[in-house]
Amino acid sequence: MEYSDKQIAAQEAVRYIKDGMVIGIGSGSTVNEFLYCLAARMRKERLQVVGIPASKKSERLATELGIPLTTFATYQNVDIAIDGTDEIDDQLYLVKGGGGSLVREKMIDLVAETFIVIASGKKKIKKLGSFPVPVEVVPFGWQATEQRLQQFGCQTNLRMVEEDIFVSDNQNYIIDCDFKEIDDAEALHRSLKQIVGVIETGIFINMVDKAIVADNGELSILEK
């Protein structure tokens, strides 16, 4: 059987899961592969774990696969977080949020003792910016917030689903900001966060402990 790069990265990530762990579950297609692999290992080894999902989509799939779920009300500490990414650079900085779950993903990834990113090789780039930076904003006055975002030299698009405005799991809007190329991701993130109305950006700085990247069947483990 020939596996996709997403499946190869997911299979490697499951090796880091130990019995009794609280797992932060990100979102996206690569994380879906991780959930399939995790469920298979749980059945085979009777592995006992619980997960905290970052999105309703991940929550639904985990439930379908029989993976027990919990919340921060029960566990405030996360042993390991597994998440995908839209872009990752040489510093292991990320642009995430194409699925619209960036706030919850960042909350989980920040509190995790270990944060592992899984990705296919096409997500590995030299400099962030080829993928628009998602910015989650308060719905009230979003037009004014968008105008202030544009002052940073980006092209902006309010995220839509067909004819309707996309609404995040937190009931907010997302403005996708196309910077083309980001020279200083850390400074940009700080500046965007200072805009009133901005809740969070999809730039993830100094958070990743390990990246598992599969490119044309070849596996690479990247660490700082």
Swiss-Prot record:
Organism per entry: Oceanobacillus iheyensis (strain DSM 14371 / CIP 107618 / JCM 11309 / KCTC 3954 / HTE831)
UniProt GO cellular component terms: cytosol
Similarity annotation: Belongs to the ribose 5-phosphate isomerase family.
Record keywords: Isomerase
Enzyme class: isomerase
Complex and partners: Homodimer.
Top-rank taxon: Bacteria
Database matches in InterPro entries: NagB/RpiA_transferase-like, Ribose5P_isomerase_typA_subgr, Ribose5P_isomerase_type_A
Database matches in PANTHER family: RIBOSE-5-PHOSPHATE ISOMERASE
Function: Catalyzes the reversible conversion of ribose-5-phosphate to ribulose 5-phosphate.
Active site residues of this protein: E105
Name the record gives this protein: Ribose-5-phosphate isomerase A 2
